[in-house]
Structure formats: structure tokens, C-alpha cells
């Protein structure tokens, strides 16, 4: 498999879950730079049913690991660093910017930053525990079959779109 099925599947699923809305369209381009049979980079632009616009860049090429999902809303930006398990909210600034040239160039200013304290557990262990609980009929933190199917459909649409380019 390539970067789309390995990584973009999770990004798309996280995006849909976080926004509470499914994808209605995707457009993607891929790159093959490392000599592998499958793609090692994909850039996806998408739109969700609720009108949210999505941009995912996923790759195996970057020499450093960067796995962030950024949601920009009317009050600020929520950044989920899925590699480190960090969640940070950057509130839009409320103070007027007195320097006109900077205000025109920058747009929204940065206000308070809140970094949420989260328990950091080993992801594969958590995944296995949830799988066990699903088999035993315990708990409620399971992905439904329809959610899993939707994630796979989006993944296939990404690959289909990329082939058309």
C-alpha cells in the first residue's frame, strides 16, 4: 500500500469525525518519488456535507514526522498533533492591531493559546483494547461499520481522483 491507504485513511476519518460530517467531494494529486510501486505523497482538497473545506497533505518523503490536523473555525484554530498526542487551541486575538500594514497583511491575530492536558497512552495498545472490548460487547468507543466503510470510500475516491490527474 501507499501513503493514501496507510495514512490518509486516518486523516480523512479523523476529519469527518471531528467535523461531524461526511465528505461530498475530494480532489487529489499524488507523487511517486522514492521508487516505490505506490504513491508516497498525496495532497487532498475536499469538501464536507456541512460546507467545511479540507486540505490534507500526507507523505512518506519528509525527513521529519509531522502528523497534525488543523481545524480553523470562527473563534480560532484547533491543532491535533496525532503523533505526539497533543491538542492545542489558538484563539483568535481580540485586541486591535494598531500597525495598519501588519493588520492588512496578517488578517486574524493570535490570542490566547490553550494546550490541553491529555493522557498519553500507547496507540496500538489502545487500539487492541478497543478491539477486544468490541468483540466482548463492552464499551462504546467503537467505530461503526458504516463509519469504517465511509473512510474506505473516501480513500478510494482520493486514489481515483489522483489517477485522473
Task: Label each region the model flagged.
Residues 49, 130-165:
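C-terminal helix-rich "cap/oligomerization" subdomain common to oxidoreductases
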Residues 18-21, 74-78, 158-161:
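Phosphate/oxyanion-binding loops and surfaces in catalytic or ligand/nucleic-acid-binding neighborhoods
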Residues 43-44, 99, 159-162:
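Short alpha-helix boundary/capping motifs
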Residues 74-146:
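C-terminal glycine/acidic-rich active-site capping loop/insertion
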Residues 11-15, 125-129, 155-156:
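A general structural signal for well-ordered alpha-helical segments in protein cores
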Amino acid at each position: 500500500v501507499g501513503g493514501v491507504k496507510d495514512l490518509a485513511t486516518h486523516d480523512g476519518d479523523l476529519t469527518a469525525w471531528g467535523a461531524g460530517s461526511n465528505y461530498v467531494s475530494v480532489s487529489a494529486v499524488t507523487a511517486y518519488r522514492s521508487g516505490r510501486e505506490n504513491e508516497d505523497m498525496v495532497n487532498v482538497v475536499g469538501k464536507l456535507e456541512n460546507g467545511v473545506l479540507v486540505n490534507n497533505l500526507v507523505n512518506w518523503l519528509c525527513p521529519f514526522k509531522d502528523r497534525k490536523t488543523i481545524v480553523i473555525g470562527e473563534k480560532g484554530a484547533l491543532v491535533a498533533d496525532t503523533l505526539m498526542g497533543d491538542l492545542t487551541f489558538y484563539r483568535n486575538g481580540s485586541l486591535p492591531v494598531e500597525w495598519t500594514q501588519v493588520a492588512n497583511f496578517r488578517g486574524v491575530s493570535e490570542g490566547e493559546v490553550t494546550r490541553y492536558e491529555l493522557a498519553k497512552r500507547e496507540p496500538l495498545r489502545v487500539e487492541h483494547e478497543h478491539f477486544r472490548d468490541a468483540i466482548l460487547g463492552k464499551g462504546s468507543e467503537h467505530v461503526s461499520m458504516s463509519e469504517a466503510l465511509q473512510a474506505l470510500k473516501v480513500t478510494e475516491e482520493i486514489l481515483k481522483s489522483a489517477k485522473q490527474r
